[in-house]
A protein has these predicted regions:
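Start-of-repeat signature of ankyrin repeats
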Residues: 15, 19, 57-58, 91, ...
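Ankyrin repeat boundary signal
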Residues: 9-14, 50-54, 84-87, 119, ...
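A generic tandem-repeat structural signature
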Residues: 41, 48-97
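Leucine-rich solenoid repeat scaffolds
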Residues: 92-112, 182-215
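Ankyrin repeat A-helix N-terminal signature
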Residues: 25-36, 64-70, 97-103, 122-128, ...
Length: 215
């Protein structure tokens, strides 16, 4: 890179005609490539564009690192000045990408670094009860669909407290979102001590797996 700094601005075109930078390649799925952080640091030092989006899509390297749960790469990107709240990801901001794809480690990292939590479903998925309460009490009130989607996301994140809050606001215990063929009980079923309590609570309130609902 020292001998050929112009490589930092290289764009690679895929079969669909979309172009991506070497920073995107370093952050691409599944992430966690050997020396990923060091490679990104080297590219930034050589002048790589932090905010350059994939041509035609607008996703920045931080969006891709978020979707891959690659905290090592994200740390270098954020330290270099990457926009924590860049729009136009496959789901939205880097944080929204992380939450939507269930990448909890990097979601927490982004919140800790100051990413905005300005969506009901993001607060629910991350178990941010006080932030969720603000959304639930502000005007205009969230719609039924927004309540249901946030409830599903709370279960996605294994967050029993925010799930209960949304259930008390009328969430459908068996809501099936358009973007995932799983009920709240299905998506909550990756067991750990926190999720086990959530799964038990869902069952106590009549939640069913999708196989039962299809019968």
């Amino acid at each position: 890179m020292a001998e050929n700094p112009e490589l930092a601005a290289t764009q690679i075109e895929d079969r669909k005609g979309d172009c991506r930078s070497l920073l995107h390649v370093a952050a691409d799925w599944p992430g966690h490539f050997p020396n990923g952080g060091a490679i990104v640091h080297c590219l930034l030092k050589a002048g790589a564009d932090l905010e350059g989006g994939v041509h035609g899509k607008g996703e920045t390297p931080l969006h891709w690192a978020a979707s891959s749960d690659d905290v090592e790469v994200a740390e270098v990107l954020v330290a270099g000045g990457a926009d924590l709240n860049a729009p136009n990801g496959s789901i939205g901001t880097p944080l929204e990408n992380a939450v939507g794809y269930g990448q909890w480690q990097i979601a927490r990292f982004l919140v800790d670094r100051g990413a905005k939590v300005d969506k009901l479903w993001v607060a629910a998925a991350l178990g941010m009860a006080s932030r969720l309460a603000q959304f639930l009490t502000k005007s205009p009130q969230p719609t039924k669909d927004e309540i249901n989607d946030a409830f599903w996301q709370a279960c996605h994140g294994g967050q029993i407290r925010t799930a209960k809050m949304l259930f008390q606001h009328g969430a459908d215990i068996n809501f099936n979102p358009f973007h995932n063929n799983s009920t709240p009980l299905d998506i909550a079923g990756n067991f750990d001590s926190r999720r086990e309590a959530l799964v038990d609570w869902l069952k106590d309130n009549g939640a069913q797996p999708k196989e039962v609902l299809k019968v």
